[in-house]
A protein has these predicted regions:
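Generic structural signal for small/hydrophobic residues in well-ordered secondary structure
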Residues: 18-21, 61, 116, 141, ...
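Alpha-helical elements of Rossmann-like donor-binding domains used by nucleotide-donor carbohydrate transfer enzymes
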Residues: 30-31, 53, 67, 71, ...
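Short, surface-exposed acidic
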Residues: 38-48, 77-88, 212-218
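Generic hydrophobic alpha-helical segments
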Residues: 45, 54-58, 104
């Protein structure tokens, strides 16, 4: 059931969403299993690719995908064609989560200023951007690979606030990674750890209620 967020006396005006794991699907284990059948190889791929620091270097825009694939090959010995297939499947797997898009639309309809802040390489965002239609809800989008900054570092949250002239106390950040949520809080933003759309809706409403301004007539 759709929730009518109270906004008239709510000082929070801005909601910032992560992409992977929040608005779009991000399931590395399923991605790996879709390309590789062998369980030992799946473990190797997860450790040496998805959990390796090179993955964050791609997100930060310091490592191009074509160069990363060469590094993956050097660590795993998996044929380059198979690694290219894996990286293409990564892009194709980034599909919208319907319940999350519904929440995004609810917030947009009620007048919240919506923004996007995501750790993602430029090439991956360039792939998904023309495929989906929810981007118009955002007043601004920041992709880590474009600005060479990365969550949960404080500088990326400060860049967000500065770039769009947002007040931290009037802004809520939504992310599925605990350290990113903590990073946002340390930068002065309100923050929600995303589990699913319904839980996120409840957490947002709780924050809105806690920040509610009481009119003088009700004091």
């Amino acid at each position: 059931m759709k929730n009518d967020f109270v906004t008239k006396l709510n000082p929070i005006k801005n909601v910032v969403f992560d992409l992977g794991g929040v608005l779009i699907a991000w399931k590395p284990d399923e991605i790996i299993a879709s390309v590789f059948d062998d369980s030992d190889l799946q473990t190797l791929i997860k450790r040496e690719i998805f959990q390796h620091p090179d993955w964050l270097e791609m997100d930060k825009g310091h490592l191009e995908e074509i160069d990363a694939i060469q590094r993956f090959y050097g660590r795993t010995g998996v044929p380059l064609t198979k690694l290219e297939e894996l990286m293409q499947f990564v892009k194709e797997s980034l599909t919208p989560i319907p319940e999350s898009i519904e929440l995004l639309e609810e917030l947009a309809a009620q007048g919240f200023n919506l923004y996007c802040l995501s750790n993602m390489p430029v090439c991956r965002f360039a792939h998904i951007q023309p495929l989906h239609k929810f981007w118009h809800h955002f007043k601004g989008i920041i992709i880590s690979g474009e600005i060479k900054m990365l969550k949960p570092d404080r500088e990326i949250f400060e860049h967000l606030l500065s770039e769009f002239q947002l007040q931290a106390s009037a802004t809520v950040f939504v992310d599925d990674i605990p350290i990113n949520v903590e990073g946002a809080k340390e930068a002065g933003l309100h923050a929600v750890l995303f589990r699913d759309a319904d839980d996120c809706r409840r957490q947002l409403q709780s924050i809105f209620d806690s920040q509610q301004i009481v009119p003088d007539s009700e004091i």
